């Protein structure tokens, strides 16, 4: 395909339509990219043991194949031949050596011999991988002397253009086996001295639209990537970053390193070729770059015209929240209480503005065509602001949890041990859809003395922004407005999740996919639930009028809630009874679509459910018949999500068995699953519902945002082998 083709518009357009939030405004140029050069370094091609990293190479080839299929012209510049050849020759030398030979000092192998062996091995791997993907590749070996020939450039372009027209992937490498260059490697001739500068030179000669350089780190950092204080630079501006960057150690292999990549990238971008340095360890870095996502470091000739970002970095936001939380903890209980009361008043005073911004979000959501259940969760209904303000006042009136003493023990005479509550530190809450969650979470964070970072969904951006503004406006300067930070850019989440030295707990509130992604991406403890697959079991002794009320409430009251009923289990003896038939008719009248498990499908001719482990979040549910209470328990423990489950029965023994054996965070008897809520439990509000078993479980209120510390009050005691210490370990009254 010639350079006048449609390029990768299909991929970019499709992705942009699917996920606008991922696209960064500074990366909009990718929509016009046609010809791409991808440079992959030795540290990416090989593993720590020097052998080929087949998983990374496979992911690389799959991405190249995808781009090739979409109409992009892709050129690959690869390193790794010397390393691969050295590994192969070491093995060959080992098998041909005697024990005596191995006792002698081992001389390093000639790099040119390693390159000669490694080039064929490396290219054979590329050929095999691309062939499996129905892609043809070609090898082109060059040296710096080739570019000294004035006619070489024309021949190079002619050959590469012919290959690209045939949809062949050109794979370039420096021909180290016959290169006449000697150390130190430097650009004394103005041509190239490693594969980074080769990639830059090829980008210029072949008129590439984009150069992607894959490294063993995620991009360019302000300092060594191993330094926690180093920050990734998403857009390089030479005037701003040129003198501030300090480079760490060079790559463990190869001749380049980040300094060489920066030099090559800066030169290429100065010539008008955008460059992105990104991680070659991620399986989708190239595709993300082509989606316009803010990953890696961008070098662009016009970057200095874009201006410096005035927004705080992820680390700066987290550190500011921690500092403000310490100021908050210094206040008296009454002063902290007053902040909450002021927030409640501010919400009510700004109700019209809040509902106006929320309506703007709703209008946009409906225009885009978001699912009705999502729009329902976004909606701030009439009376909701008053209800939220009331919840905040309830939280303010709760006993102050900070420094609350849980235990006092006399360890020895005049030596007293105390265990007290204290704040966790800084919380990161990532939530979808529900702007009212922002208010609840913020009030609980303030009451518990924690700093807070909030990231809401793009669909409720205006609602979240105005609520954040109103709440922080009520926080006094002595504490600081940055106590609660609002993260507006999705790309910042990845940076925040790396800050395990600053952020103490992550609470994701949203889909199973969101929670799973967060857990996989961070070392910070994560609290929350992935699914809300809640069950109601109607036992054979159930009062069917009661059952009807509970089931209708659990399903219809708020079907998008995580504590709404998703599966209705019924004792087999109730099949075809008047009470159950009446209940099913009422559900259908309310508009509930009922899907059947195998038994219900056969006996009631209901549409068959695909999986019992399914959360509808809408006016739909699953119905299945079970043999007895034990069968119901087994079903719930197998297919449930450990959220909230309920039994309806007049049999006390069956109820107790259910309550004790269902392994869920909340288990009810004769009560709707919709009661599983922090406010309804008297917690004032909740940051979420945890289905885990560590730290907190069920609706998480103020107590779940606290940890403990040990205080020991002595009078000069020393251990000294426990000589002279008489341990009493006597429990003391709490003060």
Swiss-Prot record:
EC number, UniProt record: 2.7.2.11, 1.2.1.41
Gene Ontology CC terms, in alphabetical order: cytoplasm
Pfam families, A to Z: AA_kinase, Aldedh
The entry's keywords: Amino-acid biosynthesis, ATP-binding, Kinase, Multifunctional enzyme, NADP, Nucleotide-binding, Oxidoreductase, Proline biosynthesis, Stress response, Transferase
Cross-referenced SUPFAM superfamilies: ALDH-like, Carbamate kinase-like
GO molecular function, one term: ATP binding
Residues at which ATP binds: 215-216, 221-226, 255-261
Stored CDD domains: ALDH_F18-19_ProA-GPR
Pathway terms, separated by semicolons: Amino-acid biosynthesis; L-proline biosynthesis; L-glutamate 5-semialdehyde from L-glutamate: step 1/2; Amino-acid biosynthesis; L-proline biosynthesis; L-glutamate 5-semialdehyde from L-glutamate: step 2/2
Chain residue ranges for the region called Glutamate 5-kinase: 1-315
Regions that span the bilayer: none
Extra facts: Tobacco plants over-expressing P5CS1 and P5CS2 have elevated proline levels and display enhanced abiotic stress tolerance.
Function noted in UniProt: P5CS plays a key role in proline biosynthesis, leading to osmoregulation in plants. Involved in abiotic stress tolerance.
UniProt-listed PANTHER family: DELTA-1-PYRROLINE-5-CARBOXYLATE SYNTHASE 2, GLUTAMATE SEMIALDEHYDE DEHYDROGENASE
Protein name: Delta-1-pyrroline-5-carboxylate synthase 2
Organism: Oryza sativa subsp. japonica (Rice)
